[in-house]
């Protein structure tokens, strides 16, 4: 059984987490709590019954220039365009292939939609670390940047339609 995403806190057990990508595992174990404390990003975790983290994602505010954005994304927007960055998203190897990553993207999308009621946001942006990750994000509705195929974006309107 896996919990619904909740904000990372000191009671969560991070050490056993292993998604298969060292840099993503290490970010959770070494940076996530520091970023949570300083406000640099917010991390949301799903745990097993023992508080071991089994999946996570992080969100941060940012902006993207219009020339790096797909046409629909930049239409009628200022330069730079306000966005939320889906900074990290990972699932423990024990849960790969069970739809957890897709559920995390949905949860992140719902949070972004909620925040957009208070502050201006055009959508969500992600930097894919691999071709496999890029293909996943495209399957869940993200569109690649015309300048960098590993930077993908989804508009707020598309998020609303997909969640």
Curated annotation (Swiss-Prot):
Consequence recorded when altering residue 88 to G: Loss of toxicity
InterPro entries: Acyl_CoA_acyltransferase (IPR016181), GNAT_dom (IPR000182)
Domain of life: Bacteria
GO molecular function, one term: tRNA binding
Residue intervals passing through the bilayer: none
pH dependence: Optimum pH is 6.5-7.5.
One record GO biological process: regulation of translation
Reaction(s) catalysed by this chain's protein: glycyl-tRNA(Gly) + acetyl-CoA = N-acetylglycyl-tRNA(Gly) + CoA + H(+); L-isoleucyl-tRNA(Ile) + acetyl-CoA = N-acetyl-L-isoleucyl-tRNA(Ile) + CoA + H(+); L-leucyl-tRNA(Leu) + acetyl-CoA = N-acetyl-L-leucyl-tRNA(Leu) + CoA + H(+)
Enzyme Commission numbers on file: 2.3.1.-
Annotated active site: 137
SUPFAM superfamilies from the UniProt entry: Acyl-CoA N-acyltransferases (Nat)
UniProt keyword tRNA-binding present: yes
CDD domains listed in its UniProt record: NAT_SF
Pfam families: Acetyltransf_7
Gene3D superfamilies named among the record's database cross-references: 3.40.630.30
Family: Belongs to the acetyltransferase family. GNAT subfamily.
Subunit annotation: Homodimer. Forms a complex with cognate antitoxin TacA2.
UniProt protein name: tRNA-acetylating toxin 2
Taxonomic source organism: Salmonella enteritidis
Gene that this polypeptide is encoded by: tacT2
